[in-house]
């Protein structure tokens, strides 16, 4: 990736995978105060899961996600969400498709829809029984 990618928020943590003093992968970890069906909750959002091409298929992304989940659990976060182009990979890391309405802001405009790429992972003892996820701002 090139350029100023983190245009909305700077991640809470950036988890790196390093081999031979080179970054070979990373995932951005965000903590976000949201509303789940009108109830306040802090959730985790994972973004920018990237692994260098020659390291793909070797468990690097799974290790990054596992570490990101550990960080979120340290903050008693019950849910981690992400927005994926393809669900296939993230299913093996415990994510399931979200079927709820998501509200957010994009280009200073309020939007809402059910996003096919939205996925959630239950990190705590609570179940994701959410009808409306209010992100209280822009999508990362």
Where are the language model's segments positioned?
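Short loop segments at secondary-structure junctions
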Residues: 19-22, 54, 122-126
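Conserved active-site alpha-helix within GNAT-family acetyltransferase domains
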Residues: 74-79, 84-109
């Amino acid at each position: 990736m090139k350029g100023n990618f983190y245009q909305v928020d700077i991640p809470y943590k950036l988890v790196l995978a390093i081999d031979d003093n080179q970054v070979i992968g990373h995932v951005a970890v965000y903590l976000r105060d949201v509303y789940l069906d009108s109830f306040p909750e802090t959730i985790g959002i994972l973004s920018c899961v990237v692994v260098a091409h020659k390291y793909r298929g070797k468990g690097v992304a799974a290790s990054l996600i596992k570490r990101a989940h550990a960080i979120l659990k340290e903050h008693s976060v019950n849910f981690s969400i992400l927005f994926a182009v393809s669900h296939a990979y993230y299913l093996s890391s415990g994510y399931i498709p979200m079927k709820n309405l998501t509200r957010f802001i994009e280009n200073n405009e309020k939007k809402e829809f059910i996003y096919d790429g939205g996925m959630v992972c239950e990190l705590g003892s609570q179940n994701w029984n959410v009808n409306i996820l209010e992100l209280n701002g822009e999508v990362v």
